[in-house]
Each structure stands twice: as C-alpha cells, then as structure tokens.
Amino acid sequence: MARVPPPALKKDKKEKKPPKDNSKNVMRNLHIRKLCLNICVGESGDRLTRAAKVLEQLTGQQPVFSKARYTVRSFGIRRNEKIAVHCTVRGAKAEEILERGLKVREYELRRDNFSATGNFGFGIQEHIDLGIKYDPSIGIYGLDFYVVLGPTRIQCTTQKTQDWQGWIPPIVLTKEDAMKWFQQKYDGIILNSKK
C-alpha cells in the first residue's frame, strides 16, 4: 500500500481587509437613551419630600424613592429607610434638561465623568441654577445627572427575535465614543482628570 502525499498547503492567504469606516453608518449614531436624576438626602422625612418636589418641578414626573440597603449607625440610617429620590427621563425632555445641566457646568466635564461603557454623569450644587425659582419652604438641593447613551438601533438588539438570521449583534460603546459624541453635540470641553 502506497502512501498518498498530503495535499499542498495553500500559499495564497486572503489579504486582510482594512477596517470599515463606521462614521457614515446612520445606525451607529448615538442618542440619549435615558437621563437619570438623583437627589440623595441621606435621611427620610420632610427634607426628602421637599427633594421630591424639586424633581417633580424639574421633570414634570412623579419621582421614585430609594431605600437604604444596610443599617449604618455612623450615618444614622436604618435598613429599608427611604433616603433618596430619583427620576428617569427620556426623549426630548431629557435632552432639554441635560442642556440646562450642562449650561450650569459651562459644558466642561472631566475624563473621569465618562464610564468605560460609554455613559457619563456629573453633579450640580444648587437646583436653582437650572432655572427653577427659589422657594424658601423647599430650600436648595444639589442633584446628580446620569446619562445613558446608545445607538439608534438599540430597540432591535433588545427585542427577542424568533429567526436567528435577523439577529443584530449589539454595538459596544467605549469611553472615547461618548467623549467624541459630547464634544460634537455640545461643543463640550473635556478636562484632564484630577490627580
């Protein structure tokens, strides 16, 4: 029995294609998926209800109360005690509130404000800077802004489809994508991190 020699190896390897330029792809354009506003008072009672009134004036929506997960004696909070209030805003209202918040910050954010997953957040000291009239019975509260960015086609990736041929792989956002979007949309300035 004679041995058959192995088939000749292909010397012509496929050349690697240059990476696609995705900047022209409309489905990769970013938009604000949601804006989360948070006021953490650290205690329940009258101050927390006044903070809820501030969020209701700002967004026009009913805010949600957050409870403490653990009892912390040094902070004076108990488990399941309401200590914060937050609200989620979407659509054109989210863009308008974000614009007012960035105007207070003079469109300047630090690199540390951006997360590795393409989201960013910042805080302001006084809610009256957003254009809400000062009410002595409410007082002054600071609040946090958290912005979740996503591509235009995000609704396609979150739906379960029955035929797997129609499945679209999700677009993974990076810190650089979010910073580039912020600079293009708002002509924002990104400062170096504090050291």
Curated annotation (Swiss-Prot):
Keywords: Cytoplasm, Nucleus, Ribonucleoprotein, Ribosomal protein, RNA-binding, rRNA-binding
InterPro entries assigned: Ribosomal_uL5 (IPR002132), Ribosomal_uL5_C (IPR031309), Ribosomal_uL5_CS (IPR020929), Ribosomal_uL5_dom_sf (IPR022803), Ribosomal_uL5_N (IPR031310)
PROSITE patterns, alphabetized: RIBOSOMAL_L5
NCBIfam families named among the record's database cross-references: PRK04219.1
Record note on quaternary structure: Component of the large ribosomal subunit.
Entry's family note: Belongs to the universal ribosomal protein uL5 family.
Cellular localisation: Nucleus; Cytoplasm
Name of the gene this protein is made from: RpL11
Gene Ontology CC entries for this record: cytoplasm; nucleus; ribonucleoprotein complex; ribosome
Signal peptide annotation: none
Gene Ontology biological process terms from the UniProt entry: translation
Functional summary from the UniProt entry: Component of the ribosome, a large ribonucleoprotein complex responsible for the synthesis of proteins in the cell. The small ribosomal subunit (SSU) binds messenger RNAs (mRNAs) and translates the encoded message by selecting cognate aminoacyl-transfer RNA (tRNA) molecules. The large subunit (LSU) contains the ribosomal catalytic site termed the peptidyl transferase center (PTC), which catalyzes the formation of peptide bonds, thereby polymerizing the amino acids delivered by tRNAs into a polypeptide chain.
Protein name: Large ribosomal subunit protein uL5
PANTHER family for this protein: 60S RIBOSOMAL PROTEIN L11-RELATED
GO molecular function: rRNA binding; structural constituent of ribosome
Main localization, broad class: nucleus
Record Pfam families: Ribosomal_L5 (PF00281), Ribosomal_L5_C (PF00673)
UniProt region (Disordered), positions on chain: 1-25
UniProt superkingdom: Eukaryota
